[in-house]
């Protein structure tokens, strides 16, 4: 009897150990800490429902930007530190949509339509460059992202925008640093089928439309990765020699992945803006790749393997911690240092994520 019990205990422990290894001990610790913050929130005076709302909002804003990492990881191009190229495409689509006089939901649709050719052109050039420097993609991508943002800092002042809602009032030219989306596509997705419990005295609002939009894109990405092209792309990333021997064009697959990633970055920033309520330009896109990279790595991805589950888990853990940690600690010590704590936590998680080499077992 004792031998049978010890055997069952050993089996249970083996299963538990396998589950921990599969999920990843670091992610388990991060998830446990996030759960602890949610539990502690009501005891330090932070409204629990409000914190859930904030976390879901930040998840819906950032999830597509994290999803943009998946194609390039699958093709072996590594982490997309050149995400600002896609973001710039989205910003061009957003500002031109407003400049052309579109309002409401149509301004969001037209922003995507206008951003698409920019994303395709910039993505193709970016992909061509990465094909020339195989092995150093992530370093070059970082410089591409930084230099493109710096170049656009000049162009935002020089491009002939005339819409009064966007240009500087004293000169009538040059775009403002921050542009309000009120009257345009502010919360155009978030308010679709949104669940608002404020009428019942609960400060919980679920941005259903934004979550559904992300779910659709995530499903399309999953479906694409299971097509012939998607399978060839994954083969290029996992074993280039085998893919080449099978007749797959490595450069073509890598180019497709970069273009797709750039387009997702453009759509992702538009979704971010509609939830946030503002367009921010000039240096705003400079470091937006780093939280997205950190999120997908924390979710369990590696530099050559990623899944939709990694995107969802990583985005929720990263944005949950960035949202909850400052709120709980602020309420606990009664000092307004939320921004300092947010910077420490977000950059600390980025450093941790970038030091990881493998997926779940690390």
Short names for language-model regions:
Residues 29-41, 69, 146-153, 210-222, ...:
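Hydrophobic core segments of alpha-helical transmembrane domains in multi-pass membrane transport
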Residues 50-100, 120, 124-135, 296-305, ...:
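Single transmembrane alpha-helix segments in multi-pass membrane proteins
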Residues 103-149, 318:
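Alpha-helical transmembrane segments within multi-pass membrane transporters and channels
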Residues 201-280:
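Helix-loop-helix "hairpin" substructures at the membrane interface of multi-pass membrane proteins
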């Amino acid at each position: 009897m004792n031998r049978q019990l010890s055997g069952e205990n050993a089996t249970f422990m083996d299963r538990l150990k396998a589950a921990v290894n599969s999920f990843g001990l670091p992610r388990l610790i991060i998830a446990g800490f996030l759960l602890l913050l949610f539990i502690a929130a009501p005891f330090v005076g932070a409204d629990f429902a409000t914190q859930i709302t904030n976390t879901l909002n930040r998840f819906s804003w950032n999830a597509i930007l994290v999803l943009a990492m998946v194609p390039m990881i699958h093709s072996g191009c590594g982490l997309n530190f050149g995400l600002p190229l896609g973001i710039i495409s989205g910003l061009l689509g957003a500002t031109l949509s407003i400049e052309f006089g579109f309002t409401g939901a149509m301004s969001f649709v037209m922003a995507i339509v206008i951003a698409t050719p920019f994303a395709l052109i910039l993505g193709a050039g970016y992909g061509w460059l990465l094909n020339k420097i195989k092995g150093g993609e992530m370093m070059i991508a970082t410089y591409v992202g930084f230099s493109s943002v710096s170049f656009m800092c000049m162009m935002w002042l020089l491009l002939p925008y005339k819409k009064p809602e966007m240009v500087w009032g004293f000169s009538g030219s040059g775009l403002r640093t921050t542009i309000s989306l009120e009257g345009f596509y502010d919360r155009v997705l978030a308010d679709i089928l949104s669940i608002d419990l404020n009428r019942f005295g609960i400060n919980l609002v679920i941005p259903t439309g934004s979550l559904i939009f992300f779910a659709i894109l995530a499903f399309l990405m999953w479906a694409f990765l299971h097509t012939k092209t998607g399978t060839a792309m994954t083969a290029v990333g996992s074993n280039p020699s085998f893919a080449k021997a099978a007749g797959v064009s490595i450069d073509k697959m890598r180019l497709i992945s970069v273009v797709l990633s750039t387009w997702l970055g453009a759509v992702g920033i538009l979704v971010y803006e509609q939830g946030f309520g503002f367009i921010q330009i000039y240096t705003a896109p400079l470091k937006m790749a780093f939280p997205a990279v950190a999120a997908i790595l924390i979710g369990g991805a590696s530099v050559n393997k990623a899944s939709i589950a990694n995107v969802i888990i990583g985005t929720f853990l990263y944005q949950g911690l960035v949202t909850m940690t400052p709120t709980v600690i602020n309420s606990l010590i009664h000092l307004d240092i939320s921004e300092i704590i947010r910077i420490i936590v977000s950059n600390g998680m980025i450093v941790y994520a970038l030091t990881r080499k493998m997926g779940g077992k690390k």
